[in-house]
Amino acid sequence: MNSQQSYCHQDSLIRRGVIISVIVLIYICLPLSVLIGLIPWNMKFVTLIAGAIVAYLISRLLGYTNLDLGITLRRARPSLIAVAPFTLVFLVASILWLVLGGVRFKPTEDLGFFIFYIFISCPIQELLFRGVLSSLFNSFKMREYIEIIVASLLFGFVHIIYQDAITVVIMTIVGYFWYSAYKREPSLVGVTISHIILGVFTIVVGLVD
């Protein structure tokens, strides 16, 4: 191995180390900190926003563009088409669950929450768990099915803060389909719209908290 190859190898190792640190600290440690009370419950959304900002800035420093992170209107229509079947199926499944199993939670959210959820929370979650995560995973050259599974597990894991196993399982499954759709059409438009539709519906009818 010559000096140039050695430098490139070392640079790759450093890059992967930074990426692993970001994933561990933001995608694992932050939810755990909320769960065990190190971060107050009423600061969970502030924590989400701060984590997303840090992850975004580090991604840009690593050389990823907004296009790489899915922040683009290109392929917006195909991205909407990619999530449409799953969104429809999940809506129907949610209605069936509601009819057969009833309400799980009593909705307490006000208009201000839904404005925040639609315009800030959902877009930020999609940036963090689809756009940024997909770009970071590119450095590891994983098989796509493994990447999708890991990403969906991380998305499900963040919901441990609600201390509800059903929510974690559902979000892991939903995360699998959203990440798969994003890999097919790498624009955040489709997955964000799907997230808003499904999220608002399931919260309003009391299926998730």
Model-derived features: positions:
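Membrane-embedded alpha-helical segments of multi-pass membrane proteins
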Residues: 45-54, 111-116, 124, 128, ...
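Aromatic-anchored segments of alpha-helical transmembrane domains
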Residues: 24-33, 88-97, 152-160, 197-207
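N-terminal, membrane-interfacial amphipathic/helix-forming hydrophobic leader that caps
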Residues: 1-66, 78, 203-209
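Juxtamembrane helix-loop-helix connectors linking adjacent transmembrane helices
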Residues: 33-44, 64-122, 127, 139
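Functionally important transmembrane alpha-helices
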Residues: 167-209
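Membrane-helix interface segments
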Residues: 76-78, 107-111, 140-146, 164-165, ...
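Hydrophobic alpha-helical transmembrane segments
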Residues: 17-21, 45, 79-84, 115, ...
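Membrane-interface helix/loop boundary segments of multi-pass membrane proteins
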Residues: 127-150, 180-187
